[in-house]
Amino acid sequence: MKIRNSLKSLKDRHRDNRVIRRRGRTYVINKTNRRFKARQG
């Protein structure tokens, strides 16, 4: 999982990326290609 300040560019790298908020943190997850995981931090 990558930790980035801005998730907007990571969201646009794959069409299945989703931006999810869990426990006050923002994540990018991808069900079909799991290497596109990232957390905002």
From Swiss-Prot:
Kindly list the biological process annotations in GO that this record carries.
translation
A GO molecular function term, named singly, is: structural constituent of ribosome
Gene Ontology cellular-component annotations: ribonucleoprotein complex; ribosome
Source organism, top-level taxon: Bacteria
User: Which Pfam families is this protein grouped with?
Assistant: Ribosomal_L36
**Keywords, comma-separated and alphabetical:** Ribonucleoprotein, Ribosomal protein
Record family assignment: Belongs to the bacterial ribosomal protein bL36 family.
**Protein name stated in the entry:** Large ribosomal subunit protein bL36
